[in-house]
Amino acid sequence: MTDALIRLYDAILERKDMDPAESKTARLIAAGPKKIAKKVGEEAVEVALDAMNEDRQGVINESADLLYNLSVLWATLNIRPNDVFDEIRRREELYGIAEKLPKPTGGAGK
């Protein structure tokens, strides 16, 4: 899976400087991080709704959309997939692979 995400990310980077009129990805990047973050949120909600309905194929399809939009957001913020993979490895070393890092007090993203 990591190879597929890296290929997706690299394809997004190739479109980053394209004319927005010629590429949906370039258009989304040109809209900026707020618009992309909104798309990420929308896709996450769609994954959750399909999961609640036990729609396996829907979850698969919407998960692919979510990963695409998340990769666009990463590219816009100059976050490479390996940065995320490194964080996953760090958490695995601290807490085990199936545990989420405890949230710090003080709000989201702090």
Describe the function of each predicted region.
Residues 1-63, 67-110:
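Flexible "arm" and connector segments at domain edges
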